[in-house]
Amino acid sequence: MNLEETMPLVFERSIPGRIGFSLPESDVPETKASDFFEEAYLRSTPADLPELSELEIMRHYTNLSNHNFGVDSGFYPLGSCTMKYNPKINEKVARFPGFANIHPNQPESSVQGALELLYDLQTSLVEITGMDEVTLQPAAGAHGEWTGLMLIRAFHEKNGDTKRTKVIIPDSAHGTNPASAAVAGFDVVTVKSNEKGLVDVADLKKVVGEDTAALMLTNPNTLGLFEKDIVEMAEIVHAAGGKLYYDGANLNAIMAKVRPGDMGFDVVHLNLHKTFTGPHGGGGPGSGPIGVKKELIPFLPTPVLTKKEDAYTFDYNYPDSIGRVKPYYGNFGINVRAYTYIRTMGPDGLKLVTEYAVLNANYMMRKLQAAYDLPFDQVCKHEFVLSGNRQKKLGVRTIDIAKRLLDHNFHPPTVYFPLIVGEAIMIEPTETESKETLDSFIDTMLKIAKEAEENPEIVQEAPHSTYVKRLDETRAARKPVLRYQKEV
C-alpha cells in the first residue's frame, strides 16, 4: 500500500449482501428473540456490521498488522517496560487442552493439575521475592499496586491506626504509584532525589512521621540506579510504624541476585507479563501478583490457594481479607506462561537473565554517553536515562529523536520520563537482544545525533517512512474516538 493512501476502516469497506461465512442449517427448531426478551431489548433495525468476503477481511487485517510493531518485529527498548522476547514454548504450553479448555467454575477436584501449577508458581514467586505468601489474583501491575496498598490500609485500620493517611513516593517514581495511592484513599507525599539520582535519605527523615502508611519504592529506580541505602530507609519507615512497598516493575535487574524481602520490603507486586515473559502491550491481559510478609497475610484477597494434604483448594476463611479484587483467580493464561518460563530457566538461568540485562544496559550507556548527555554517570542496572538537552539546543527535541528511530525500524525508548530529567530518553535493552542488535541501535542513535548537528530538519520532520506520520497526541488523549459511528 502506498504511504500516501488512506486505509479505509473495515466498516467503510462493507458491501451490502457480501458474505464472509455461511452457517450450516440449524438442526434445532428456530425460535424468535421476542419469545425470550421484552420489546425494549429488541433491535428495531439490523445491526450495522461490516459485510465483506473472507478474503477481504483477511487482507484488511493483514495489512493492518503490517503497520504494527512488536517485540517479534524488532528492537523495543522501552524503558521500565522490559520488552523482552516472549518464548514461543510459553504459547504452546498455555494452549495445552488441560489448561486452555477448563473453566474456573469447574469443581476443584476436576482441575487439580491447574491448581497445582498455580500453587507451584506462588511458591516460586515467594522464593524469588523473599516474601511469605503470594496471591495471583491481581490482573496487572497497577492493579497489584492498588491491592498491596489496600492490604497496608487494612493492616493499619485493624490496628486502630487510622491516622496513617500518607504514602511517601520518590519524585522519580512511576506514574502509577501516586495514582494507585490516591485510588486507595491515601494522600501522596513526595520525597526528593539527591544529586546522585537516589532517594535523599535526609529528606525522607523529614517527611516520615506518625501519619506515614507506607513508602513506595522501585529498586533499582526509574533511572536504573540501585538504591544503596535501602536497608537504612527500611529502618526509618519501620521505626515510624509504616510499611515498605516494592514496585516490581524493575525486578529484571535483580532477579535471583537479591530479594526485596531481604531488603526490608513488606509488600511487593510483580509484573508477570514483563519480567516473566507473558506477552504485553495492546491492553493486556497481564498478571500482577503481590507478595506479602507474614503479618499482612490475613488481609490477602480471597480466596487463597492452599494445599491440604494431597489436594489443592481455595480457602475463603480469611475474616480480615480485603475481599476479592478480580473475578475468579487471576489471569490464568499469563500465569501458565510465567510458570513455564521460570521452570525452563531455573535459578541459574534467572540469574543469567539479570546479569545479561545489566551488562547490555551498561554497554549501551557507555557507547552513547559521548553523543548524549548522561545526567547520572555511574554504573546502571537494567536501564539507563540519557538527556536530549544537547540536541534541544540545536532545535531537535527528544520527541524528534524518537520519531526518527521509527525510520530505522526501531521502537523508540520511553521519552520524557522520569520527570526529573529534562528531555529524558529512557532505554532498557533487556537480556534477550544480541550484541549485533545493540550495536545497530547504537549506530542509529549516533547517526541521529549527527543529523541533529548537520541536518536537523530531517529529524524534526520524522518519521518519513511510516504509514502514519505525527499524530495530534494531545487531542487523541483528551478527545479519543474509540468506536465507529456511521455518518448520516
UniProtKB/Swiss-Prot annotation:
Molecular function (Gene Ontology), one example: glycine dehydrogenase (decarboxylating) activity
One BP annotation, GO: glycine decarboxylation via glycine cleavage system
Superkingdom assignment: Bacteria
Cofactors required: pyridoxal 5'-phosphate
Record field: catalytic activity: N(6)-[(R)-lipoyl]-L-lysyl-[glycine-cleavage complex H protein] + glycine + H(+) = N(6)-[(R)-S(8)-aminomethyldihydrolipoyl]-L-lysyl-[glycine-cleavage complex H protein] + CO2
Subunit field text: The glycine cleavage system is composed of four proteins: P, T, L and H. In this organism, the P 'protein' is a heterodimer of two subunits.
Descriptive protein name: Probable glycine dehydrogenase (decarboxylating) subunit 2
Organism: Listeria welshimeri serovar 6b (strain ATCC 35897 / DSM 20650 / CCUG 15529 / CIP 8149 / NCTC 11857 / SLCC 5334 / V8)
